[in-house]
Amino acid sequence: MLTSWRTISLLQKTTSRFIKRSKTYADVRYNSQALQNHGVPGNKRKWMKRFVFVGAAGIGVYAWDRVYNAHALTRSIRTVYTASIIAADYKLNFSEKKADKIDALHQRVAQRLFKTIYKNGGLYIKMGQIIAMQSNNLPEAYGKAFQGMFDNAPQVEWEELQDIFKEQYGRPVEEVFASIEKRAAASASIAQVHRAVLPSGEKVAVKIQKPDVAKQMSWDLLVYKYMMYVYDKWIFHIPLYFTVDYVSERLRSEVDFTTEANNSEHAREGVEETDYLRDKIYIPKVYKEISGKRVMVTEWADGIPLYDQTALSEAGMSKKEILTNLFRFLAFQMFHSKQVHCDPHPGNILVRKNQAGLCQTVILDHGLYVFESEKFRKEFALLFTAAYSLDKKSILQVMDAWGIGQPELFANRMLNIPMDEEQPHTGEKIISKKEAFQQQLAERKKFIGFLQDCTRLPKELLMLGRCLMLIQKNNQNFGYPVNSIAVMAKVADKYTTDKPSPTWYQRLLSPIFWVFQHLFYPGNFRLPELTNDKK
């Protein structure tokens, strides 16, 4: 009996559903017929439905990207769009026929690029900083557009950081620190720093990763890879794509603060063990027991940022001493420890007086490091010692081993050594628009021929090249008070055991070169002794 009632109930439900569907179908047919009777064509109805469907899907994707994906898709689309417009603009308008409009072309491209980078934020800010530090190698419009790239990036509100603190500590942040300022003291591309005090009373800097960085990283690197491929293979034919995997790997390691803590600790130990660095360089201590992947706690270090030249002058800081300390530290890392800080831009360097009243350089942000092989370290050290002694043969030998097809370009741009026959002129030479275009075209051809064999280029050089250009730019900003090659060659020589014997003509020219240096550049080319002298 129970089975019969179940069967009857099932039949009733099925019949009811069938009747409802039939009514719905009939209504749809009736409404469709009514639309046809009112003169709405079938094709138009189809396109209306498609439009509604696509619009709804677009709104849904945008909402998902905004709420759950940290605008990563929107930023990627914005980047691809801007890069495509820039590529098309240069492809169509960078020509001899339009030489009189080249300056305007560079200006609008630089403005487009700056707006996109600043709006996207995150890792894009680092790209903007690279462009800013390369202003002397780029058209003037880029230098003007990117001159404010080292200012503080927009900071994230305190409430948005709470999930990261809970993920790190498993408890409210107020239980970890005696006090912590809710407004960031500094904000950079991927993180911001808050002042805090430990229960012990020690003042610390709490570096916390911005919440969106983890979600945006994969998207940003995917777009970077795509754009490098397109620019390399289809548009500019400049060898760029081979760098993608290595650069992406380095950037991924930078957002892991445990890696940064290890780098910082290693650098600190190296400085403390080296006589000529111990009192001149300072690396803040890391509190590893309360640091993790997305939060890092270090001791608070006061100082004047390297970019604030007015404050440095008012404090009586020596420009030469500041930069000598910086060059010695980086040379020590390049030619001895083999772990090199590759982000020495002015915002990551503070200057203060040590206990003896001497200038002391504080090095911050040890996330972006490169790790050298022993073979590369020896070749790199040889390059600098050869550069100082004007051993052109050894310089060319190293560059040939690295597959570099334009040694003059490499020496001029990265080492700041003039190897070509072109002599510097005094004053500003007035040239025509057509001549300016020809110069830019020649520079582009040089760069294309720069990498003769990408398979032989040491990957370390990709990041070290950035490091060298950054510190050369710092030197330029201060008016070149230090001969960086002389300072770094002295350190390289200290850690080079297999030194080649000088040739007869090097011995012959050495006294002449010495007289030339001291007559025209008194004190600037002298190899400084690696001591803790208190000059």
UniProtKB/Swiss-Prot annotation:
GO MF annotations in UniProt: kinase activity
Gene Ontology CC annotation, any one: mitochondrion
Pfam families linked: ABC1
Family label: Belongs to the protein kinase superfamily. ADCK protein kinase family.
Name of the protein: ABC1 family protein C10F6.14c
Organism for this UniProt entry: Schizosaccharomyces pombe (strain 972 / ATCC 24843)
